[in-house]
């Protein structure tokens, strides 16, 4: 099993998208890229901790590659906006790829460059590519949020 960590705006929708992908074993939403140890949603919402709402993915590379997960990421959000996605604004909603090893870093750089050259967007890609730091899981009520909403209906 391999691990991938991405940020692409509000983590609820990102988790919903990745949880449906064949080869994804598990997803967990949380916070990464910041300075505060064990941040809460309230902490991260201030925009002062440096954390991004993110998703930690465990996947089976014999079923889906890291490169294919990057394609899902690019199609899940607008990578040309800085610190915002849709109605959500602030550095906690930034677009980022948190790589876990050199192979992931290289794949992310290549993928971002290919997307830039594709002409799909008029603006430049703002997605950060940074070394993964500690991932802190979000509170339970954030986990599988959209799935929980479906069960309540």
UniProtKB/Swiss-Prot annotation:
Q: Which Gene3D superfamilies match?
A: Peptide methionine sulphoxide reductase MsrA
Role of this protein: Has an important function as a repair enzyme for proteins that have been inactivated by oxidation. Catalyzes the reversible oxidation-reduction of methionine sulfoxide in proteins to methionine.
Q: What class of enzyme is it?
A: oxidoreductase
Q: Which gene encodes it?
A: msrA
Give GO MF terms, alphabetically: L-methionine:thioredoxin-disulfide S-oxidoreductase activity; peptide-methionine (S)-S-oxide reductase activity
* Enzyme Commission code: 1.8.4.11
Instruction: Supply one GO BP term.
Output: protein modification process
Q: Does the keyword Oxidoreductase apply?
A: yes
Pfam families for the chain: PMSR
Q: Which reaction does it catalyse?
A: L-methionyl-[protein] + [thioredoxin]-disulfide + H2O = L-methionyl-(S)-S-oxide-[protein] + [thioredoxin]-dithiol; [thioredoxin]-disulfide + L-methionine + H2O = L-methionine (S)-S-oxide + [thioredoxin]-dithiol
Domain of life, per lineage: Archaea
What taxonomic ancestry is recorded? Archaea, Methanobacteriati, Methanobacteriota, Stenosarchaea group, Methanomicrobia
Active site feature: 10
Concerning InterPro entries, the annotation shows: Met_Sox_Rdtase_MsrA_dom, Met_Sox_Rdtase_MsrA_sf
Which keywords, in A-to-Z order, does the entry hold?
Answer: Oxidoreductase
Designated name of the protein: Peptide methionine sulfoxide reductase MsrA
């Amino acid at each position: 099993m391999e691990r991938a960590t991405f940020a692409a705006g509000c983590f609820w929708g990102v988790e919903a998208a990745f949880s449906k992908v064949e080869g994804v074993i598990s997803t967990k939403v949380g916070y990464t890229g910041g300075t505060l140890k064990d941040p809460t949603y309230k902490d991260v919402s201030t925009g002062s901790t440096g954390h991004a709402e993110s998703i930690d993915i465990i996947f089976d590379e014999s079923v889906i590659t890291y490169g294919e997960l990057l394609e899902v990421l690019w199609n899940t959000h607008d990578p040309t906006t800085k610190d915002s996605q849709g109605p959500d604004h602030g550095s906690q909603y930034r677009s980022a790829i948190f790589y876990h090893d050199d192979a992931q870093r290289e794949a992310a750089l290549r993928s971002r460059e290919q997307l830039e050259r594709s002409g799909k967007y008029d603006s430049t890609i703002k997605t950060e590519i940074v070394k993964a730091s500690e991932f802190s899981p979000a509170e339970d009520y954030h986990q599988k949020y959209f799935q929980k909403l479906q069960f309540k209906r």
